[in-house]
């Protein structure tokens, strides 16, 4: 029985109630580790006392009671005192009795640090830095006695501090997506607090083709910073739009990373602040997401299906027969894109699913192209220097120059 190993452990190592109870953390319910450790010591003393009554006092049993007393077990200390034997408790072999009597002190440090930030938060995550020698001593016991029911001292510290901080501040513990993260150094008592970013998923539409004098598109970032009283906003987009391309229709996926927010308003209130802002970018369909959504969004870009409208000028006249020929040729056609960087050459295959067009007037053509999200649309139209094969220009046999490009729809 694994709990029977407790006496073997205490014969060799004096342990406080916390550090003994933690070795058997998976046994029993409704007990914290301090209560569990005390209960184990009570049980061991009762077993020893029963044997003394049945067998008489032996050196073995007396030494076991002394081992319990050295581990700070008050009933064992009194038991020996009644026999005229005085035993002083030793320091806990694992924690040195320097951890669990300071929990309230550390809780006050954490609470004061959080309150001094002057920010809104509803959840927190708490971690601790525990000296390596303490962790190694704990590990040596679980290894030596083959204990499989233990939990780590860091886990107990984090849980006990977390419960008390939560009760004092009225905020919840959230391991996955906290508003703030706290780390306490149990050696120094110092506290580090990190304000966690907020991630907002949205769809953006770029309604203006022209850009400002600095060559940049104006996002309503200042409105977002204002809403969250944040330090900054980082923009993560699902793909990139070539310069001068409008994004219409349902818009392109985007995630806004709000850095060090002091306020945490509802996204509906933020959306109301962004409406009719007069910026180049219009944001819709706002929702809170996890940080992992950024990686997932970027990984899906190549699987997007994008519908482009391209207005192009051609060197020669384009006939309806040319349009039909392009339509038939590019239905579900693979296109190879070549990227050169110095001597390195990289090829990427993209799909063109559908191509339609109409002649607006002589040498002015409008194309509707439905293709894979990673297709370089300008290169597909004009062909470049053979960087995209096949291309519209290459198939027609004369120059085709795109002058306007709009994204009409993105299916993700």
From Swiss-Prot:
InterPro entries named in the record: Pus10, Pus10-like, Pus10-like_C, Pus10_THUMP_arc
Top EC class, one word: isomerase
The THUMP domain, residue ranges: 73-197
One Pfam family this sequence matches: Pus10_C
UniProt-recorded name of the protein: tRNA pseudouridine synthase Pus10
Gene3D superfamilies in UniProt: 3.30.70.2510, 3.30.70.3190
Catalyzed reactions: uridine(54) in tRNA = pseudouridine(54) in tRNA; uridine(55) in tRNA = pseudouridine(55) in tRNA
Family statement drawn from the similarity comment of this UniProt entry: Belongs to the pseudouridine synthase Pus10 family.
Example GO molecular function: tRNA pseudouridine(55) synthase activity
Residue stretches spanning the membrane: none
Role according to the record: Responsible for synthesis of pseudouridine from uracil-54 and uracil-55 in the psi GC loop of transfer RNAs.
Binding-site positions, substrate: 308, 376
Keywords: Isomerase, RNA-binding, tRNA processing
Organism: Vulcanisaeta distributa (strain DSM 14429 / JCM 11212 / NBRC 100878 / IC-017)
Any GO BP annotation: tRNA pseudouridine synthesis
EC number: 5.4.99.25
């Amino acid at each position: 029985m694994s709990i029977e190993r407790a006496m073997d452990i205490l014969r060799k190592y004096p342990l406080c109630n916390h550090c003994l109870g933690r070795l058997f953390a998976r046994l029993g319910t409704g007990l914290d580790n301090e209560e569990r450790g005390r209960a184990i010591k009570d049980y061991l003393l009762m077993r020893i006392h029963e044997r003394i009554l049945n067998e008489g006092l032996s050196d073995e049993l007396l030494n076991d009671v002394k081992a319990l007393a050295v581990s700070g077990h008050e009933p064992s200390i009194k038991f020996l005192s009644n026999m005229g034997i005085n035993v002083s408790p030793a320091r806990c072999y694992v924690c040195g009795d320097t951890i669990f009597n300071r929990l309230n002190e550390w809780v006050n440090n954490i609470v004061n640090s959080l309150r001094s930030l002057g920010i809104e938060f509803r959840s927190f995550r708490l971690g601790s830095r525990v000296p390596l020698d303490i962790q190694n001593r704990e590990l040596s016991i679980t290894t030596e006695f083959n204990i499989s029911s233990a939990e780590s001292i860091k886990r107990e510290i984090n849980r006990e501090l977390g419960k008390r901080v939560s009760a004092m501040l009225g905020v919840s513990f959230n391991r996955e997506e906290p508003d703030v993260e706290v780390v306490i150094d149990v050696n120094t008592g110092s506290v580090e607090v990190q304000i966690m970013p907020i991630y907002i998923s949205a769809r953006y539409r770029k309604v203006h083709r022209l850009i400002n004098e600095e060559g940049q598109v104006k996002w309503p970032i200042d409105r977002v910073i204002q809403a969250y009283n944040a330090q900054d906003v980082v923009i993560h987009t699902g793909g990139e739009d070539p310069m001068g391309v409008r994004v219409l229709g349902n818009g392109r996926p985007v995630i806004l990373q709000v850095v060090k927010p002091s306020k945490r308003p509802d996204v509906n209130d933020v959306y109301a602040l962004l409406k009719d802002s007069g910026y180049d970018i219009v944001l819709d369909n706002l929702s809170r997401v996890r940080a992992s959504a950024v990686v997932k969004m970027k990984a899906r870009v190549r699987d997007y299906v994008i519908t482009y409208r391209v207005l192009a000028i051609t060197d020669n006249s384009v006939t309806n027969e040319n349009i039909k020929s392009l339509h038939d040729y590019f239905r579900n056609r693979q296109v190879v894109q070549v990227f050169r960087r110095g001597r390195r050459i990289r090829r990427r295959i993209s799909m063109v699913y559908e191509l339609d067009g109409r002649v607006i007037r002589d040498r002015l053509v409008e194309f509707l192209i439905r293709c894979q999200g990673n297709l370089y649309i300008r290169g597909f139209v004009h062909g470049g220097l053979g960087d995209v094969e096949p291309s519209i220009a290459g198939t027609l046999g004369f120059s085709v120059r795109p002058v306007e490009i709009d994204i009409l729809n993105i299916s993700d």
